[in-house]
Every structure is written in structure tokens, then in C-alpha cells.
Amino acid sequence: MKRILLCLSVLICTFTNAQETVYKTIENLTYATSQDAYAQERCKLDIYYPENLKDCPTVIWFHGGGLTSGNKSIPTKLKKSGMIVIAVNYRLLPKVTISECLGDAAAAIAWTFKEVEKYGGNKKKIFVSGHSAGGYLTAMIGLDEKWLNEYSIDADSLAGLIPFGGQVIS
């Protein structure tokens, strides 16, 4: 009986390990549409995705920093969640205007719509989120359709907006 239980345990462990999701990160992909040097430097994103899953939801994450500082990072709480997470850098004040920050956010979202299926994502499951200044970018992109219209994307095609602590007065 012990041998049967041992064999069964080994079989279950083997099956469980075979199903484990493996995640991969690709860093510093350029999404910039502008060719100026500052855009080429800052308009980069990292994509964290499960290698063996398809039809995954995607969260585009904009960092905080008052639009004047900060850098992209994949939030720990979103890792190993069965989702694709895209962490975005954007140009910062005072080198650019708030409108250019919003334009960068829209360009990153457009990049995601164009590229996410290559990484196992589903265009119908794209969420936009961020903290502080990232929350502001999230809200403004969703509330003012002109930003995504520039890329022929309807803001209503986003699965959801999840801003964390951003002011909404421009």
C-alpha cells in the first residue's frame, strides 16, 4: 500500500510541476512614435508574460512620480498572476508638456493593442492601471477619447481602468 501511495504521490507531483507556468520578462522595448532623442531614451516598456498561456488578460502599468520622476517596474503583486504585465516609462516634466506625457501613454497602449497577441494576450482583455501620476495617466486616457483616437483605438475597447491615487485636474 505504501508503494502505491508513493507512486501516486510522485505521479501527482510530476503532473503538478509539468503544469507550472513559466514567466519571461523582456526589457526596454521601444514604443515611441517620435524620433527625438528624449523619446527614444524614455519611451520604453518591459513586458512580463506567462510563456505557456494564451488568451491572457493584460495590465499596462504606469509608474508614479508626479510626472517629474520615476521609472517603470513590474509590481510584485501582479507577478505570477496568469496575466501579462507591461510596465511603461514615459517622458517627464519639465522636458515635455503634460500633453506629451499623455501622448506617450496613448502610444504605449497602442503598442500593446498591436503587439500583445504575440505574447499570449487578448486585445479584449487590456486593462490600464498606475499609481499616483500613473493613475492620472490612466484616468485621462480613459476619460478623453482623443488620446487613443489618434491611433484609431476606441477608449471603450479597454477592458478597464484601474487608477490608484491620481489627481484628475489638468
What is the predicted function of each stretch?
Residues 96-117, 140:
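Alpha/beta-hydrolase active-site loop
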Residues 65, 89-96, 167:
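Short beta-to-alpha linker loops that shape the active-site pocket of alpha/beta-hydrolase fold enzymes
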Residues 55-64:
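Short beta-strand element of the alpha/beta-hydrolase
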Residues 57, 83, 159:
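Alpha/beta-hydrolase fold active-site loops
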Residues 1-22:
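Bacterial Sec-dependent N-terminal signal peptides
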Residues 19-53:
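N-terminal cap/lid segment of alpha/beta-hydrolase-fold proteins
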Residues 71-88:
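Short amphipathic alpha-helix adjacent to the substrate-entry channel of hydrolases
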Residues 113-170:
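Primarily recognizes the serine-hydrolase "nucleophile elbow" in alpha/beta-hydrolase
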